């Protein structure tokens, strides 16, 4: 997923993104887009019920029309929500509002592994291992739970500002 963290924030009219400013599920006020991938975009959002900032992953328009794909998205969201690991983003909620299929997740301030590699390359082996150990631990936990990530790449690995 490509990071948009440094993109300018704005309104739907200013950015051309109709989701910005929208209220999903009468609960999530969508803010700035922070990442975009082939199947979905991720936005910073406010959970109005719990008064907290979350990440909302929204499938691109039309992706939810494929019933098999949408069903897999929901199954994987439910499975991911049961996964509790310090190096796995927590899934809080899942929904579908008028064809807008979404996940509400923990917002992890930080950068992608791709960003870290670009900034720190070449890096000592000890640093590379320190970055990869939590990733491998998270993947092992997911696999024990019967989950397969399907898209492990540096752009999809978050390195939190707090180091996790």
How would you name each of these model-derived features?
Residues 94:
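Activation-segment/catalytic-loop signature of the eukaryotic protein kinase fold
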């Amino acid at each position: 997923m490509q990071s948009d963290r440094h993109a300018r924030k704005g309104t739907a009219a200013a950015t051309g993104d109709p989701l910005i400013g929208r209220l999903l599920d009468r609960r999530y006020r969508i803010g700035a887009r922070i990442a975009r991938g082939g199947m979905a975009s991720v936005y910073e959002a406010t959970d109005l019920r719990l008064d907290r900032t979350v990440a909302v992953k929204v499938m691109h328009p039309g992706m939810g029309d494929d019933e098999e794909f949408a069903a897999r998205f929901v199954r994987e969201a439910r499975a991911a929500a049961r996964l509790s690991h310090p190096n796995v983003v927590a899934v809080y909620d899942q929904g579908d509002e008028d064809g807008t299929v979404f996940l509400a997740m923990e917002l992890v301030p930080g950068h992608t592994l791709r960003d870290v590699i670009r900034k720190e390359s070449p890096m000592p082996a000890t640093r590379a291992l320190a970055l990869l150990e939590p990733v491998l631990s998270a993947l092992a936990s997911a696999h024990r739970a019967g989950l397969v990530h399907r898209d492990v790449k540096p752009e999809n690995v978050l390195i939190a500002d707090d180091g996790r």
